[in-house]
């Protein structure tokens, strides 16, 4: 988890989605695609330690004068229960089905801005070694059922993994869980946001 994502936002996140190497291609009409993992705090109202991840895919498109391609890493902080449950549906369009915004950056960045307080999801990206807030508005985030089946050896939904704890975290997820439990062990959200 990058150092320039404000610690107070990490501590208040109910879930985190990590999407490494999202591919962006553009020749007049652009598109992006990537796969990654969503991991949530366990227990009632997401107050426990980090649990087993569910696999997700990000897809997006745009039109404009553009040429080229690149790979970008994304970290999405899901800031409340409503945002978490929206993402766990079959698919969610960021900005339409869930309020998304580019997250503030820097250790001293304040989390009290209007954009941050209204957003259900804050997005960060890294290209060429630099992490910054970026908007993913208009992109679609959906469960990657095939990847979940491959990871857990059976069909299991994101809701069953993240909310109901129906599967144990696989060995491949232990490093991410350990990093998150070390970096942000407790949910410090306002109790009102957890309802």
Segments (PLM) and residue ranges:
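Small-residue-enriched, tightly packed secondary-structure blocks
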Residues: 1-195
């Amino acid at each position: 988890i990058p150092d320039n994502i404000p610690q107070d936002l990490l501590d208040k996140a109910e879930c985190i989605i990590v999407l490494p190497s999202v591919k962006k291609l553009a020749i007049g009409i652009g598109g992006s695609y990537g796969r990654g993992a969503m991991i949530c705090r366990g227990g009632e109202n997401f107050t426990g330690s980090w649990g087993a991840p569910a696999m997700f895919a990000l897809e997006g498109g745009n039109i404009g004068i553009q040429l080229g391609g690149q790979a970008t890493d994304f970290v999405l902080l899901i800031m409340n229960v409503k945002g978490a449950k929206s993402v766990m549906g079959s698919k969610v369009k960021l900005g339409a089905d869930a309020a998304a915004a580019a997250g503030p950056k820097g250790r001293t960045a304040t989390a009290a801005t209007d954009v941050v307080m209204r957003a259900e999801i804050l997005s960060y990206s890294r290209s060429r070694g630099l992490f910054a807030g970026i908007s993913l508005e208009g992109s679609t985030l959906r469960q990657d059922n095939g990847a979940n089946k491959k990871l857990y050896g059976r069909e299991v939904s994101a809701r069953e993994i993240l909310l109901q704890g129906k599967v144990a975290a696989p060995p491949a997820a232990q490093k991410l869980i350990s990093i998150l439990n070390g970096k942000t062990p407790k949910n410090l959200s306002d109790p009102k946001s957890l309802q």
